[in-house]
């Protein structure tokens, strides 16, 4: 299977006003003029051939089929297949990273660029809802609860399709279902995202696919679902994963060259501003540790209790009252 290489520049979006008219224009813009795949959103042909090939000489092989095709399950399944297409996965990935002015900013995305992802913005939410929440609703309507089942429907073509799918399940719900609606993130989409994240890690995608491993703003999203889990064993995996990413960043602060174009470029970017790169890696590790300690202590995130209808324990109430982490919730 060949992946088309379409070259296009990545435009940084302008911030819209709060009016619905402007929001509508922005949604229309994203529908009509989203940039196509740039050099870091398309797998080089030779690399993809190595991934998909069954040759034993390949150092990394992407498993295209996890379980047999289960076929259509009525209108809901047909609707899902209509919504969850390769084109939509490409559009989501382009939208998610379009604010980065240079491809090199994907390797190390500074805090000024990460705000788009982690600071609540109604205009950003509106686009997520208009463009991508129909896919989420189509998934919900099928009642799919297995990550492997969903993967058998999607059939990711490359590691970048996996990236888009994880962002779709782990991040878009957080932009689409806020406030009292947030429970669906925690009870439905998060478990799917965790399963697919763990499957990706088991296949070695974030650790071995160069366009993920050495492009750290890509790699980070593979591990985010683990951070959101309330399962301590999943956090153990998250700690290991973020530490591996940090070690890779540190390995680039010295030496020259690399085994592929992605590693070579990543080394150039890191060595151009090593403190910035180190901060990105260390911050990810520390942020996961802040999440894990809460799960280790309470077995769950206290700040989710209200929206999930869980009774607040006294020690949890004390924790929140004293300024315990809620991570923006």
Q: What role is predicted for each listed range?
A:
Residues 1-68, 75:
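N-terminal mitochondrial targeting presequence
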Residues 52-329:
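Intrinsically disordered, low-complexity activation-like regions
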